[in-house]
Structure formats: structure tokens, C-alpha cells
Amino acid sequence: IGDICGVPYEFIAWKDYDKINLFHPKNDYSDDSVCTFACAEAFLEGKDIAERLKNRCLADPNRCYGLGFRNWLSKPGIAPAYNSWGNGSAMRASSAGFLAKSEDECVDLATKTALPTHNHPEGIKSAVATALAIFYAMHGHDKEYIRTNVLNKFYPKWDFYTKGGYRNVTAFIGCFIKTYYL
């Protein structure tokens, strides 16, 4: 839902969060939803994640895929990972947090979602941190536990203004921790 409602505001330095229209006429799913579904399908059907990512994304080419990811998609077969540390690995890792039965399995599944393209250590870390936050929330841990075991563990100097994929990870986990609504 957040991905769909956020599409009209992507790449805009939006400040008036209270004025976001959740029913904006330009709401649509993005590349992040396509990749998220591809990873979930791969896990649920026992398929290769890289193949599923490539097939799903090529079947839905008009999403806002990043340049490195588009280059990866355009190569024949399954191309090697390109060492990305952007936010794509975090954006598609949620199924690992939902489907894992243990913390170790969550880390393993999240790593698998990152590796086809985001094999840089920071790319993997972003996927793992995202999935673990979801895993902990799904298993009843409170926000302080998530802060301690995700933000403080993976990003001890976190703030909302860092670079790379972890910028998004620290921002969305930080927002989750600070909100009164969840």
C-alpha cells in the first residue's frame, strides 16, 4: 500500500506529509512491488530468485527500475550481480521477514533476495535489516526491541540523512519506531 500511495511523490522532496493524498489519481505500483512479488513467488514456489526477478520485471518493463537494474535486466541470461548498495535490496526483502520461521532463516532469505543484484555488503545489510524488522514485528517484539536489534545493531550511528540503501532503511524503521499509530 505504501509503495502504491508513494508513487506520485517519488523523487520529490515532499515536506507536507499531512497533505499526502492516499487516493491520488496517479497511484500505481512501482518497480519495488514487482520485485517484492517476484521474491515472494520464488520462495513460495521454490524457484530461483534471480530468474523470477528477471522474468517478472521484463514482463512489466514500464516501472521505474534503476539504471543498474535495467542494465542487469537487458543482458542475456542471468547476469552477475553488479555490487549495488542502493535501496532496491531493502525494498524487495519483505517476504523474507514474513516467511521465515527463525531469525537465522530470515537472514538467509533476505540475503538471497539481495544477491542477484545487490551483492555489496551494504546492499545485503539493508535487505537483512529490513527483513529482520518485519520478522521481529511479526513475532510480537516491541519497537524498542526492533530499535536495539536492528537500527542500533546494523546502523549504530543511524540518522535520517545517510547515503545509500541504508538511508531508506534507517528512515522507514525510524518512522515506524516513532509513530503512535502502529
Located regions from the model:
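Structured, active/binding-site neighborhoods that engage oxygen-rich ligands
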Residues: 1-182
